[in-house]
Amino acid sequence: MVDKRESYTKEDLLASGRGELFGAKGPQLPAPNMLMMDRVVKMTETGGNFDKGYVEAELDINPDLWFFGCHFIGDPVMPGCLGLDAMWQLVGFYLGWLGSEGKGRALGVGEVKFTGQVLPTAKKVTYRIHFKRIVNRRLIMGLADGEVLVDGRLIYTASDLKVGLFQDTSAF
């Protein structure tokens, strides 16, 4: 049985990456450096824009984060794909929180819009995931819309984020 708390610490997220939070068969978050959040501050089975579930998580920004040193030299900015990946990570985390099992894989996204950037001078990135649908069949899949904010300002939106959980990924 999954401990369905409303919030999770960095240590909890690291435990997920080791397969300890949702059990050996549950989906895992990536380990650092690809883990793109420091905490989950809210998880609910209702709520969000569609009243089908909501997740909110945060990443603390500091100039020493690994991507600022290489993207780009003299013009440091967090790659937009990392914010997108964070949203996929949270969709998979939510599926594990619901008690689903399998290996998480991003399956796609409808549309992504970037209207801002994350610079090393920022303090905090906030991710908001609004669930539209959970499919519980042979393939378990989450479908959601997401938002990325930097210091409270909306900078990315993504529609139709899709993550599936697979028992066997050898043929994927």
UniProtKB/Swiss-Prot annotation:
Domain of life: Bacteria
Keyword tags: Cytoplasm, Fatty acid biosynthesis, Fatty acid metabolism, Isomerase, Lipid biosynthesis, Lipid metabolism, Lyase
Keyword Transferase among record annotations: no
Broad class of the protein's primary localization: cytoplasm
The name this protein goes by in its record: 3-hydroxydecanoyl-[acyl-carrier-protein] dehydratase
Catalysis: reaction(s): a (3R)-hydroxyacyl-[ACP] = a (2E)-enoyl-[ACP] + H2O; (3R)-hydroxydecanoyl-[ACP] = (2E)-decenoyl-[ACP] + H2O; (2E)-decenoyl-[ACP] = (3Z)-decenoyl-[ACP]
Enzyme Commission (EC) number: 4.2.1.59, 5.3.3.14
Record GO cellular component, one term: cytoplasm
Localization (cell): Cytoplasm
Coiled coil, from the record: none
Molecular functions (GO terms): (3R)-hydroxyacyl-[acyl-carrier-protein] dehydratase activity; trans-2-decenoyl-acyl-carrier-protein isomerase activity
InterPro entries in UniProt: FabA, FabA_FabZ, HotDog_dom_sf
Function summary: Necessary for the introduction of cis unsaturation into fatty acids. Catalyzes the dehydration of (3R)-3-hydroxydecanoyl-ACP to E-(2)-decenoyl-ACP and then its isomerization to Z-(3)-decenoyl-ACP. Can catalyze the dehydratase reaction for beta-hydroxyacyl-ACPs with saturated chain lengths up to 16:0, being most active on intermediate chain length.
Subunit composition and interactions: Homodimer.
Assigned protein family: Belongs to the thioester dehydratase family. FabA subfamily.
UniProt pathway: Lipid metabolism; fatty acid biosynthesis
Annotated active site: 71
Gene: fabA
Gene Ontology biological process: unsaturated fatty acid biosynthetic process
UniProt-listed Pfam families: FabA (PF07977)
Lineage of the species this protein comes from: Bacteria, Pseudomonadati, Pseudomonadota, Gammaproteobacteria, Enterobacterales
